[in-house]
From Swiss-Prot:
GO biological process, alphabetically ordered: translation
Entry protein name: Small ribosomal subunit protein uS5
SUPFAM superfamilies: dsRNA-binding domain-like (SSF54768), Ribosomal protein S5 domain 2-like (SSF54211)
Keywords for the protein's UniProt record, in alphabetical order: Ribonucleoprotein, Ribosomal protein, RNA-binding, rRNA-binding
Comment text on domains: The N-terminal domain interacts with the head of the 30S subunit; the C-terminal domain interacts with the body and contacts protein S4. The interaction surface between S4 and S5 is involved in control of translational fidelity.
Native organism: Clostridioides difficile (strain 630) (Peptoclostridium difficile)
Family membership noted in the UniProt record: Belongs to the universal ribosomal protein uS5 family.
Subunit and partners: Part of the 30S ribosomal subunit. Contacts proteins S4 and S8.
GO MF entries: rRNA binding; structural constituent of ribosome
Matching InterPro entries: Ribosomal_Su5_D2-typ_SF, Ribosomal_uS5, Ribosomal_uS5_bac-type, Ribosomal_uS5_C, Ribosomal_uS5_N, Ribosomal_uS5_N_CS, Ribsml_uS5_D2-typ_fold_subgr
Function: With S4 and S12 plays an important role in translational accuracy.
Amino acid sequence: MLRRKPIDAGQLDLQEKVVEVRRVTKVVKGGRNFRFAALVVVGDENGHVGIGAGKAMEVPDAIKKAVEDAKKNLIVVPIVGTTIPHEVRGHFGAGNILIMPAVEGTGVIAGGPARAVLELAGLKDVRAKSLGSNNPRNMVNATIEGLNSLKTVEDIAKLRGKKVEELLG
């Protein structure tokens, strides 16, 4: 497995998308305590994307915490032209997603939370199909896990100790 270097979020021009904001409740002896949980995706539309979650008493604070968390969890997505190098499956909890490369001009064909991740990663032509849970947290994590497992031909050649030409025949 290739070791991934930590990414400095300060040097990237990151955009953020709020995927989900939920009101969560803690029931105590004196009644109910309400807080807000936010799920946010950040990315520079140039191969860097991350997800984060945050909780707070107010929605803006929860979003702010989620953005900070997302900046700590950035990954690099290998992009070939405007799409991904190969088909990949992501799995997290009950969330399963199939991400497939697409020809130029196709656009991003993906549902809900997965679309936010793929767009902020900088992918212009890609198809995705959710095969499991439609829970936003599981879908986003499955998408990130799938994108994180992508490898380019150069990566595979380096792992096998061969040249790219040998692999491609």
